[in-house]
């Protein structure tokens, strides 16, 4: 399966629902969103372990508010870095491996062309991404080291995670075992619990946006669709296979869409394919809003029960959106063996191999081999792009990017 498209815009879709809602119709716009093969964590909050996660979230909200209301700007410049190679390209920019001249550290530099960002109507998403990245701080989320702009481009400098995307490892080995899927899912649950406590919706969960480091832990990357929302929002964005039914039906939605996406991700990790797929997006949407899910025979009863409660079309029954919030997910029997604090503190090693699984491909997926901080072997796309580029002599579209 090729890397999937993100979509942003409106959607042409028509569906009758059991509750008598009228059909919804609009137009669809599809675009590639530049992947961010990178990851960064500012100060390690594991240096001061927290036994009470709720206590941590209270403190995290205070720290986030301070950074959100006082966003950092122009914390470096292009001349501070040696540009080594292009790691990937997208419709309005590219990601480059760079080396910070003063520290010698390697980073992934996300470079966005201002004119292309404007042409593709991604100004708001780009400004949101930068503001969110400079304000968040959590072990399983990509954070930003530096950001700056010049006459032509916007720059976000992120720690380079050389283990590569979960997507490529999952496609290579087929599927993950339930213990391995649970190990990864637990990190996503904690990350979403953190984001949602800050009124942030992620909206773009998929294996392509999950990086695996050399210790086997995840980093969620690409916050281009993330948004701070206290109530509901109506923007159509995401990846077709991962869209919640309320997004497709243009009903307005809240943080519950992330928990639906978690269900899709867990299913895809454990099965090797998503629960809703077809040749055309419209066919995918029809399957999603139908609410019908077929499970592989090897899924445990506990896993099937969890997925039935996450892939729940009825928002009044979907786990994560009920009175107990995320506790319904964390206390589910499929997560019965999960030590949530130990996961947060990164004290848990990936589950041991079961008989028949101990092969090179699986080991490489769980513990990606890297030879040094600049190893790019897990970024399989060979991109022939020059490391030098022309910067405009005069400011372009400056008024649109004042907040960057």
From Swiss-Prot:
EC annotation?
A: 2.7.11.11
Q: Which SMART domains match?
A: S_TKc
Active site residues of this protein: 204
In terms of InterPro entries, this protein maps to: Kinase-like_dom_sf (IPR011009), Prot_kinase_dom (IPR000719), Protein_kinase_ATP_BS (IPR017441), Ser/Thr_kinase_AS (IPR008271), STKc_PKA (IPR044109)
Q: Where is the Protein kinase domain?
A: 81-335
Residue ranges that the Swiss-Prot or TrEMBL entry lists as coiled coil: none
What residue ranges are annotated as transmembrane?
Answer: none
Q: Does the keyword Glycosyltransferase apply?
A: no
Q: Which residues carry this modification: Phosphothreonine?
A: 233, 376
Q: Which PROSITE patterns match?
A: PROTEIN_KINASE_ATP, PROTEIN_KINASE_DOM, PROTEIN_KINASE_ST
Q: Which UniProt keywords apply?
A: ATP-binding, cAMP, Kinase, Lipoprotein, Myristate, Nucleotide-binding, Phosphoprotein, Serine/threonine-protein kinase, Transferase
Phenotype on deletion? RNAi-mediated knockdown of isoforms a and b in neurons shows a temperature-sensitive adult onset paralysis of the distal part of the body resulting in the loss of backward movements and an inability to lay eggs. RNAi-mediated knockdown of isoforms f and k results in no obvious phenotype.
Pfam families, per this entry? Pkinase
Query: Where does the source fall among the domains of life?
Result: Eukaryota
A single Gene Ontology MF term assigned here is:
cAMP-dependent protein kinase activity
Residues reported in the UniProt entry to bind ATP: 87-95, 110
Catalytic activity, reaction form:
L-seryl-[protein] + ATP = O-phospho-L-seryl-[protein] + ADP + H(+); L-threonyl-[protein] + ATP = O-phospho-L-threonyl-[protein] + ADP + H(+)
**Modulation of this protein's activity:** Binding of cAMP to kin-2 regulatory subunits induces dissociation of the heterotetramer. The released catalytic subunits are active and able to phosphorylate their substrates.
PTM details? Answer: Isoform h and isoform j are myristoylated.
Which cellular components does GO assign to this protein? cAMP-dependent protein kinase complex; cytosol; nucleus
Q: Name one GO biological process term.
A: signal transduction
Q: What does this protein do?
A: Essential for larval development. Controls the rhythmic contraction of enteric muscles probably by regulating G-protein coupled receptor aex-2-mediated calcium influx in GABAergic DVB neurons. Plays a role in the control of oocyte meiotic maturation by gonadal sheath cells. Isoforms a and b: May play a role in the regulation of neuromuscular junctions.
The similarity comment for this entry is: Belongs to the protein kinase superfamily. AGC Ser/Thr protein kinase family. cAMP subfamily.
* Quaternary state and interactors: Heterotetramer composed of two regulatory subunits and two catalytic subunits.
Q: What is this protein called?
A: cAMP-dependent protein kinase catalytic subunit
């Amino acid at each position: 399966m090729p890397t999937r498209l993100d979509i942003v815009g409106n959607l042409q879709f028509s569906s009758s629902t059991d509750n008598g809602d009228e059909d919804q119709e609009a137009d669809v716009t599809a675009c590639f969103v530049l992947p961010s093969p990178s990851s960064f964590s500012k100060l390690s909050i594991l240096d001061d372990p927290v036994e009470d996660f709720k206590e941590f979230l209270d403190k995290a909200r205070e720290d986030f508010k301070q950074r959100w209301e006082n966003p950092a700007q122009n914390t470096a410049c292009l001349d501070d870095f040696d540009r080594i190679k292009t790691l990937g390209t997208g419709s309005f920019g590219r990601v480059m491996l760079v080396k910070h001249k003063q520290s010698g550290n390697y980073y992934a530099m996300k470079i966005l062309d201002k004119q292309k960002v404007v042409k593709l109507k991604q100004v708001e998403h780009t400004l949101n991404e930068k503001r969110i990245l400079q304000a968040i701080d959590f072990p399983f989320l990509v954070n930003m080291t530096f950001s700056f702009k010049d006459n032509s481009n916007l720059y976000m400098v992120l720690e380079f995670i050389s283990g590569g995307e979960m997507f490529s490892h999952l496609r290579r080995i087929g599927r993950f075992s339930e213990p391995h899927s649970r190990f990864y899912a637990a990190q996503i649950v904690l990350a979403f619990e953190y984001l949602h406590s800050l009124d942030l919706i992620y909206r773009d969960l998929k294996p392509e946006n999950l990086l695996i480091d050399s210790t086997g832990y995840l980093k969620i990357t690409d916050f281009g669709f993330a948004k701070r929302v206290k109530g509901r929002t109506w923007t159509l964005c995401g990846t077709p296979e991962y869209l919640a039914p309320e997004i497709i039906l243009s009903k307005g939605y809240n943080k519950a869409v992330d928990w639906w996406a978690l269900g899709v991700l867990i299913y895809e990790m454990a099965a090797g394919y998503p629960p809703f797929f077809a040749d055309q997006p419209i066919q995918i949407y029809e399957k999603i809003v139908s609410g019908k899910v077929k499970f592989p025979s090897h899924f445990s009863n506990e896993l099937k029960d969890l997925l039935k409660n996450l892939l729940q079309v009825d928002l009044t029954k979907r786990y994560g959106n009920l009175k107990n919030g995320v506790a319904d997910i964390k206390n589910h029997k499929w997560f019965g063996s999960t030590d949530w604090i130990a996961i947060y503190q990164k004290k848990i090693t990936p589950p041991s191999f079961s008989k028949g699984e101990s092969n090179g491909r699986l080991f490489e997926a769980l513990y990606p081999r890297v030879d040094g901080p600049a190893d790019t072997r897990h970024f399989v796309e060979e991109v022939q792009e020059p490391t030098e580029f022309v910067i405009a002599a005069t400011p372009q579209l400056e008024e649109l990017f004042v907040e960057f």
